[in-house]
């Protein structure tokens, strides 16, 4: 299926143009992070095979790893049954979390 048709099936309207995106290590299946994608960031992710997200606080797109070198190389992208959440299986280089931890989910509640 071509890229534009795949993107069109995603329901960006439920959350005002954004969609929650879970990133998981493609080998270990460890959950690395959750971020939000816009249609534009999903298109950029599909085009260059690294993760692009939408920063709600900065109101801009960002490429994971562009500053830190901790890129996420996309291996597979899945969408849930409601077409409103994305799961990305990726090869993580270095830490996924801005704190320097491998995963953003390193604390117990």
Swiss-Prot record:
Zn(2+) binds at residues 81, 97, 104. It catalyses: 1-(5-phospho-beta-D-ribosyl)-5'-AMP + H2O = 1-(5-phospho-beta-D-ribosyl)-5-[(5-phospho-beta-D-ribosylamino)methylideneamino]imidazole-4-carboxamide. InterPro entries: PRA-CH, PRib_AMP_CycHydrolase_dom, PRib_AMP_CycHydrolase_sf. SUPFAM superfamilies: HisI-like (SSF141734). One of its GO terms (molecular function) is magnesium ion binding. Pathway: Amino-acid biosynthesis; L-histidine biosynthesis; L-histidine from 5-phospho-alpha-D-ribose 1-diphosphate: step 3/9. Disulfide bonds: none annotated. This is Phosphoribosyl-AMP cyclohydrolase. It comes from Clostridium beijerinckii (strain ATCC 51743 / NCIMB 8052).
């Amino acid at each position: 299926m071509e890229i534009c048709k795949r993107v069109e099936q995603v329901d960006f309207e439920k959350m005002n143009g954004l969609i929650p995106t879970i990133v998981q290590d493609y080998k270990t299946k460890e959950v690395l992070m959750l971020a939000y994608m816009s249609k534009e960031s999903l298109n950029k992710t599909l085009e260059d095979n690294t993760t692009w997200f939408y920063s709600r606080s900065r109101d801009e797109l960002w490429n994971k790893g562009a500053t830190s070198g901790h890129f996420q190389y996309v291996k597979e992208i899945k969408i849930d049954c409601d077409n409103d959440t994305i799961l990305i299986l990726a090869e993580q280089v270095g830490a996924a979390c801005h704190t320097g931890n491998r995963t953003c989910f390193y604390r117990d509640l």
